[in-house]
Amino acid sequence: MKKSYRVKREKDFQAIFKLGQSMANRKFVIYHLKGEHKHFRAGISVGKKLGNAVTRNAVKRKIRHVLMELGDHLKSEDFVVIARRGAEELDYQAVKQNLHHVLKLAKLLEEGFEIEKKS
């Protein structure tokens, strides 16, 4: 994901947490806030309770990859994805389905967009 698509500064994270709305499912929480940018900006937070650094980085890579795939269909808002316990056990397809679900609940995806389900 390009740097312009990332929420990096602590000030931005705090603004999203304080002023934004949240939506959650069993594996992920999303806080979102209208931004001034022409595209979405995403921050990813994976706590130490999920495992060691290797495990946490693997979860972040999966989330980042899903967001890159869905990028054309995301609304231009700033949001933070927080991984909950159990997210480290998910494979890529499960991460994609769970993130799609919570993004849809938060109304961050374009109307009518659905991911293709592999059988």
UniProtKB/Swiss-Prot annotation:
UniProt keyword Thylakoid, yes or no: no
Keywords attached to this entry: Endonuclease, Hydrolase, Nuclease, RNA-binding, tRNA processing
InterPro entries: Ribosomal_Su5_D2-typ_SF, Ribsml_uS5_D2-typ_fold_subgr, RNase_P, RNase_P_CS
UniProt superkingdom: Bacteria
Single GO biological process annotation from the record: tRNA 5'-leader removal
Keyword Nuclease: yes
Catalytic activity, EC: 3.1.26.5
Gene Ontology terms for molecular function: 3'-tRNA processing endoribonuclease activity; ribonuclease P activity; tRNA binding
Catalysed reactions, semicolon-separated: Endonucleolytic cleavage of RNA, removing 5'-extranucleotides from tRNA precursor
Assigned GO CC terms: ribonuclease P complex
Protein family: Belongs to the RnpA family.
Matches recorded under NCBIfam families: rnpA (TIGR00188)
Free-text function comment from the UniProt entry: RNaseP catalyzes the removal of the 5'-leader sequence from pre-tRNA to produce the mature 5'-terminus. It can also cleave other RNA substrates such as 4.5S RNA. The protein component plays an auxiliary but essential role in vivo by binding to the 5'-leader sequence and broadening the substrate specificity of the ribozyme.
Subunit structure: Consists of a catalytic RNA component (M1 or rnpB) and a protein subunit.
PANTHER family, sorted: RIBONUCLEASE P PROTEIN COMPONENT
The name this protein goes by in its record: Ribonuclease P protein component
Biological source species: Streptococcus equi subsp. equi (strain 4047)
Gene label: rnpA
